[in-house]
C-alpha cells in the first residue's frame, strides 16, 4: 500500500519532537531520525521542537499532517493529540482517550484487571502509607513507580520496608500518583505493534536491577534477543495478549506493549507506550527489522495512520 502512494499525497508533514517532559532528550533523537527519514524519501517535512508557541506554529505552518515523536507528558498523554484535533490536523498514533489512558499506568492496570487481563498486584502509595502493610500485602521485593512517567524514570526496586519510604519520595518527584507493584523476577519481553500487527517479540536482558533509563538509552550491556527464545505457540500467545491489551485501552496505529514474567513464567502486562522511541537503541525499529521492515518503510507505515485518520474525519 505504501509503495503506491505518491510522495505528494503526504502533503506537508510536521514532526513534533522535544517538548518539556523528562524524556525530552530521547524525543529529540527520535524526532530527528523520523525527520531525516521523511526527507530522505522526498517528503516535504519540517521539525518543530514543541514549546508554548507550538499552537501558533501549527496554525501558520499550513501542514497537512503531523508525525508525533514526543515522549512522555505532553506527547503521550492526549495533550498534543487534543491540540491537533482542535486544529483538524491528522496525526500519527493513538487518539486523545487512548493516549491519556495508556500514559496512566494505574488506570491501565485497573482497566486490564477489570477485563481479566493479567497484571501484577499493586497498591497505591501516599505519604501516609504504612510501609509494613504494603510489604505484607505485596511481598518483598517490590517495585515503586510513578503512575504517569515514561522511560522507567522514578522507578525503584525495593528490598526492605525501610527502603519503601525513600523510594516513594523519589517517585513522587516525577508524579503525585505513585504505586507499588509486586516484583516479577522472570524474563521481560516487548511487543511492537504496527497497524494492528504484532511484530516479533524481543526479550530483554540487562545486568542492571531492571530495564531502566540507562539500560534503555545509554548502556552497551543491554542484550536484545529476537527471536526471543519462546516456542512458536508461546510467542503467538504473548502477541495475542499484547494486542488485546493495546486495543482494550483504545490505543491505535502503532505502539509498544511491555510484559514481564513471574517465577513460573506466567506473563503479566506492565505498560503501553503509544509513542515509542525511534533512536538507535529503540525496540520498535529493531522488531520491524526482524520482520523485514526497514526503518524508512516503517516510518511511512506509521505516517499512513494519519491518512486513515484524515479519511475518517472527512467521512470518506
Swiss-Prot record:
Primary localisation category: cytoplasm
Sequence similarity: Belongs to the D-alanine--D-alanine ligase family.
Pathway in which the depicted protein is active: Cell wall biogenesis; peptidoglycan biosynthesis
UniProt GO MF annotations: ATP binding; D-alanine-D-alanine ligase activity; metal ion binding
Gene: ddl
Protein's UniProt name: D-alanine--D-alanine ligase
Record-listed ATP binding positions: 135-190
Subcellular location: Cytoplasm
Cofactor annotation remark: Binds 2 magnesium or manganese ions per subunit.
Gene Ontology terms: biological process: cell wall organization; peptidoglycan biosynthetic process; regulation of cell shape
Binding sites annotated in the UniProt record for Mg(2+) 1: 258, 271
ATP-grasp domain sequence ranges: 109-304
UniProt GO cellular component terms: cytosol
Amino acid at each position: 500500500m505504501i509503495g503506491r502512494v505518491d510522495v505528494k499525497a503526504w502533503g506537508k508533514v510536521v514532526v513534533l519532537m522535544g517538548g518539556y517532559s523528562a524524556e525530552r532528550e530521547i524525543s529529540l533523537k527520535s524526532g530527528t531520525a523520523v525527520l531525516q527519514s521523511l526527507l530522505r524519501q522526498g517528503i516535504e517535512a519540517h521539525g518543530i521542537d514543541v514549546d508554548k508557541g507550538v499552537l501558533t506554529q501549527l496554525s501558520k505552518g499550513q501542514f497537512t499532517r503531523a508525525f508525533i515523536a514526543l515522549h512522555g507528558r505532553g506527547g503521550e498523554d492526549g495533550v498534543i493529540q487534543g491540540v491537533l484535533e482542535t486544529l483538524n490536523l491528522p496525526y500519527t498514533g493513538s487518539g486523545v482517550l487512548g493516549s491519556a489512558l495508556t500514559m496512566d499506568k494505574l488506570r491501565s492496570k485497573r482497566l486490564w484487571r477489570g477485563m481479566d487481563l493479567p497484571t501484577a498486584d499493586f497498591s497505591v502509595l501516599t505519604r501516609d502509607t504504612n510501609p509494613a502493610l504494603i510489604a505484607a500485602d505485596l511481598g518483598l521485593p517490590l517495585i515503586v513507580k510513578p503512575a504517569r512517567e515514561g522511560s522507567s524514570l522514578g522507578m525503584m526496586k525495593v528490598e526492605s520496608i525501610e527502603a519503601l519510604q525513600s523510594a516513594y519520595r523519589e517517585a513522587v518527584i516525577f508524579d503525585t500518583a505513585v504505586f507499588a507493584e509486586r516484583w516479577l523476577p522472570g524474563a521481560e519481553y516487548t511487543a511492537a505493534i504496527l497497524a494492528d500487527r504484532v511484530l516479533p517479540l524481543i526479550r530483554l536482558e540487562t545486568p542492571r536491577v531492571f530495564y531502566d533509563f540507562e539500560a534503555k538509552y545509554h548502556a552497551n550491556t543491554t542484550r536484545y534477543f529476537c527471536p526471543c527464545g519462546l516456542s512458536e505457540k508461546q510467542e503467538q500467545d504473548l502477541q495475542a495478549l499484547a494486542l488485546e491489551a493495546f486495543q482494550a485501552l483504545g490505543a491505535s496505529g502503532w505502539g509498544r506493549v511491555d510484559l514481564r514474567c513471574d517465577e513460573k513464567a506466567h506473563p503479566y502486562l506492565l505498560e503501553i507506550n503509544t509513542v515509542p522511541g525511534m533512536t538507535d537503541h529503540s525496540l520498535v525499529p529493531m522488531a520491524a527489522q526482524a520482520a523485514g521492515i526497514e526503518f524508512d518503510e516503517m516510518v511511512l507505515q506509521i505516517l499512513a495512520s494519519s491518512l486513515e485518520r484524515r479519511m475518517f474525519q472527512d467521512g470518506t
